[in-house]
Amino acid sequence: NNSKLSISYLFADTDGGCENFHLPLQIICRPERGGGNGEHFMKKRVVVALGHRALGTTLPEQKVAVKQSAKYIADLIEEGYQVAITHSNAPQVGMIHTAMNEFAKAHPEYTPAPMSVCSAMSQGYIGYDLQNGIREELLNRGIYRTVSTVLTQVIVDPYDDAFYTPTKVLGRYMNAQEANEERKKGNYVIEEAGKGFRRVVSAPNPVKIVELDAVNALLDADQIVIAAGGGGIPVMEQDNHLK
């Protein structure tokens, strides 16, 4: 509601896992139709939210999972929906952050990458796979539509309580020794029963989508849009600057 994105339908992915990948989208609302002799299907917007299980963890898993998701998304497009897609980035952003920090350790002339930059990278490479997977599926059906990924920032409140209680898990599972090493670095770590330990970071609530007008313009032009991956890159306003 805060973003005013004019969304009429919401789809959410189930917890099925890549190895049991069935229909990953749950229909919450259905389209309305006009009445009388002129009854017609009114084009409506839908949001498809892909959780981390619908994307896999490794690059090969992601490519397989994206092909499956693309089929269901293409079905919606064939039915006349305008489609916006958002996605999780929990495993991916953690792997990127670890890789960038390990590189900085090996090459001291480079500084570690902040989480915001890693989030932007994850939007890019997940969007790349989704964009090409959906485009390919549409072309296989003889549908010629543009699929675009929008690098998306969200403005957050610097005083959000979430900054004091990190809850968003990221990266791979760790053993107890690795978890202790992370804690020594000042990072927050939680234990998931029977699975191991994972790092957690803050997940403040979005106040406003910075690129909202661009997303709406693309949807108005009947393009398929991938946006706000990982919930968006959290930024704070400071005068005319975002940081």
Segments from the language model and where they lie:
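Conserved mixed alpha/beta catalytic, RNA-binding, or beta-rich assembly cores of soluble enzyme
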Residues: 54-56, 224-243
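Ligand-binding beta-strand-loop-alpha-helix segment within the catalytic cores
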Residues: 103-225
